[in-house]
Amino acid sequence: MLEAVTNPKSSLATFSKQLNGLLQAKVVVCKSVNPYFNLALENYLYENSTAKHCLLLYTNSPSVIIGRNQNPWVEANVKLCRDNFVNIIRRKSGGGTVFHDFGNLNYSVLMNREEFSHTENASIMIQALRNLGVHARLNQRHDIVLAQSQRKISGSAYKISRNRCYHHGTMLLNSDLEGVREYLRSPSTGILSKGVSSTRSPVSNTKLLKAEFIKQVISCFLLHKSHSTTTKPLSKPRASSKRLYDIEPKSVITLEQNDLLGVPSILKAVNELQSWEWTFGQTPSFKQHLESTELSVSMDISVVHGRLEKVIFSTPNATLEHELSSIPWTGLCYESGFANTFLISGIHSKEAISILKWISDSI
């Protein structure tokens, strides 16, 4: 494990040495469950790791992770996530939306660009599953599914740059599958988005213990990438075994979030991932049409960078339509309850107030 720096002057050389060890690591197991830190760590290794191949393993607290080019209001129930303190995070890679929780293990394989292969990286996970008695295979969408039921247990995505790439994914061990369904079911209607849409698939848990699966994944990875000549394939773990890894200790680095708090680029990445401008402001442009027969009104919204660009109302009442159109909508963040800003002003007609309440309930 890396040691946190308590005395910068006396520990700088030690910390630098430890950091270099991290960047040369073959396997990194992060004990943090902070999704912002874990994704920032992944990006840090992606940009700085000098290892030919590096495996990163981590678990996140309950979070909805959307792809780089996706619309959170289409992919998730944003209000429910916020009500239940479930993080919504836009990652750097493409692909679809996934739900993370404590029953889920996330993996990321970092490598040189020319060595990228969906099949090769998935085969490592499949072998680890088979070693534990779970029969799985790779389908045509490059998802790992249970061989018998064909239910998805692992989805993946990737990011490729000029020289490096990473292939990362999830593994459903004992996740809250009802949470997956609830948080990834958007209540929004009438949205026409330029963003990438997720493909929904039936999912299932492997019901494996996390420690046992981690152990198998590391062993299979090291063998497959020829990092270790002394590591042997692991048999099914004994229930009495208390050791996490039966491999060379120098092959694996474990770390906590506090170990890297002094790395500026990681802190910067965490702040970016937490920002509204990144999570929602990076949403591809979209339009939404809403209408209420009860109130005899329709509303067309254009949203750019997560903010209202144009709002057009249509209602038989010309005076009401003018009143609604006169409200300064442009530039407001597209958020649940954005119309409440004007409800509290107390200067609108009764009809306009009813419509503003309808808008708040509809977004």
From Swiss-Prot:
Pfam family, one: LplA-B_cat
Pathway info: Protein modification; protein lipoylation via exogenous pathway; protein N(6)-(lipoyl)lysine from lipoate: step 1/2; Protein modification; protein lipoylation via exogenous pathway; protein N(6)-(lipoyl)lysine from lipoate: step 2/2
Ranges of residues in domain BPL/LPL catalytic: 49-229
GO cellular component: cytoplasm; mitochondrion
Subcellular location: Cytoplasm
GO MF, any single term: ATP binding
Family matches, as InterPro entries: aa-tRNA-synth_II/BPL/LPL, BPL_LPL_catalytic, LipoylTrfase_LipoateP_Ligase
Record keywords, A-Z: ATP-binding, Cytoplasm, Ligase, Nucleotide-binding
Binding site for ATP: R91, G96, T97, V98, F99, K152
Primary localization: cytoplasm
EC number: 6.3.1.20
BP-aspect Gene Ontology terms: protein maturation; protein modification process
Catalytic activity: L-lysyl-[lipoyl-carrier protein] + (R)-lipoate + ATP = N(6)-[(R)-lipoyl]-L-lysyl-[lipoyl-carrier protein] + AMP + diphosphate + H(+)
Binding site residues for (R)-lipoate: K152
Entry annotated with the keyword Aminoacyl-tRNA synthetase: no
PROSITE patterns named in the record: BPL_LPL_CATALYTIC (PS51733)
Similarity comment: Belongs to the LplA family.
Subunit details: Monomer.
Miscellaneous section: In the transfer reaction, the free carboxyl group of lipoic acid is attached via an amide linkage to the epsilon-amino group of a specific lysine residue of lipoyl domains of lipoate-dependent enzymes.
Job of this protein: Catalyzes both the ATP-dependent activation of exogenously supplied lipoate to lipoyl-AMP and the transfer of the activated lipoyl onto the lipoyl domains of lipoate-dependent enzymes.
Name the record gives this protein: Putative lipoate-protein ligase A
Organism listed in the record: Schizosaccharomyces pombe (strain 972 / ATCC 24843) (Fission yeast)
Gene that specifies this protein: aim22
